[in-house]
Amino acid sequence: VIIGCPATDTKHTNCIHEDPRVIIGNNNIIREFSLIEQPCYEEKTIVGNDVFLMQGVHISHDVCLQDKVVITNTSVLAGIVKVLEGANIAMACTINQYTVIGQYSIVATNAACMKNVKPFSRYIPGKPLSVNYYAIKKFGFEAYEKEIEEYVLNNQELVSGPLKMIVAEFNFWVVKYGHQTY
């Protein structure tokens, strides 16, 4: 495992941050051959709490992984990616820079993810977004299942308090980084 190596960035090939901070929370599992770069543009590269990085994961500069994120074998996250709470990146995925992966969503195996992924959704290339029922059950959102279905499948606005807060945070990052959403 390599933590805090210089950022790999094509715009600033020798990007050396004056005060490089890689913040790693508690109860994380970081498996062999994984790499976490120091920041280049923002103040920190962050790995939250209860994060599982499987073998050969590449976390580029300025990435933020919130709590309970799972990133599986040989996935690569480009710089300045945000993976929000409870999201799952399946095996051998590549996530484009400035992309936001919403809370409790999953990106399918071998996906090249070029846009943001809505909370509670399953992104499978070439298919319409679907609902991540596994995460709904795992994280205790069963009472909101129908509302989540309408949000993911029909773009209906969420009205329940906890869901509104989740989407508000997702939308904040989407607006900040400007990528389109699947």
Q: Which sequence ranges carry the predicted segments?
A:
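Short, amphipathic C-terminal "tail helix"
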Residues: 162-182
